[in-house]
A protein has these predicted regions:
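First exposed extracellular module after export/assembly in secreted or surface-exposed proteins
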Residues: 2-8, 13-16, 20, 106-107, ...
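Active-site cleft segment of glycoside hydrolase catalytic domains centered on the general acid/base Glu
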Residues: 3-96, 121-129, 163, 202-218
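Active-site beta-loop-alpha junctions enriched in small/polar residues
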Residues: 39-42, 85-88, 113-118, 146-149, ...
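Glycoside hydrolase catalytic-domain groove-lining segments
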Residues: 57-80, 90-158, 172-188
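Substrate-binding cleft of secreted/luminal carbohydrate-active enzymes
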Residues: 142-144, 164-225
């Protein structure tokens, strides 16, 4: 969040006007050039409640709807997404996102599941169950930030063959479930969150252990996956 937002000192009405102007200007500027937007990102707590942020505090609990309305008005043809993490593994959080989408059927075109996952979680059973609920919205489905941790607890000392095979199988599982569960008309796609392991956000924001979450090694070496 930029400092002009976090350090805003005006009234709530002035804050709303500033955010509306920002959303309108950005989306209008790229109208016809940008096909889709993640309009609101990471708005829910793990229990499905709304996170307390400067947006909820100053714009009210319905701030998500407001921002989608402004984006929709600025570019009626763009695909508008709600995006969040742990939707693929946390049923309560997924239900909150789905309820948001169902309450705003003309404003929200799709749901982005970030998919920062590990070899162990989510299981295929859990992912299949949640995907059934997500697909039932009838909206576009995007696996928006996929990467797969292989060393979340520090037990893996190197990227050996067994680890590579396990990661390959997990990537295959994810793609297989996506294709099996999401009808062709609802498939927005799968985005891998980076190319090389060395450039992964998990190098600096993970659990502090070395990891190898992407499809290419540090020097662009092909992986089995």
């Amino acid at each position: 969040v930029p400092t002009w937002v976090t350090n805003f000192t005006g009234t709530n009405a002035e804050f709303e006007a500033a955010i509306k102007t920002y959303v309108t200007n950005v989306v209008t500027h790229y109208k016809g050039k940008v096909a889709s937007w993640d309009v609101v990102n990471e708005a829910f707590n793990e229990d499905g409640s709304l996170r307390s942020t400067i947006f909820s505090q100053k714009l009210g609990s319905n701030y998500i709807t407001k921002i989608f309305q402004w984006a929709r008005a600025a570019d009626p043809n763009a695909k508008l997404f709600y995006n969040d993490y742990n939707l693929e593994s946390n049923v309560n959080k997924a239900k909150a996102a789905i309820a948001l989408i169902n309450a705003n059927p003309t404003l929200i075109d799709g749901i982005g599941l970030q998919m920062h996952i590990s070899l162990a979680s989510p299981s295929a059973t859990v992912l299949n169950t949640i995907m059934d609920k997500v697909v039932a919205t009838g909206k576009l489905v995007h696996f928006s930030e996929l990467d797969i941790l292989v060393n979340p607890t520090g037990s893996v000392s190197s990227y050996d063959y067994a680890t590579a095979i396990a990661q390959k199988n997990k990537y295959k599982e994810v793609f297989t479930i996506y294709k099996a569960k999401v009808p062709a008309t609802q498939r927005f796609g799968i985005t891998i969150w980076g190319m090389r392991d060395v450039d992964s956000w998990l190098k600096t924001n993970g659990a502090g252990f070395p990891d190898f979450p992407l499809l290419f090694g540090d020097n662009y070496e092909y992986k089995i996956a």
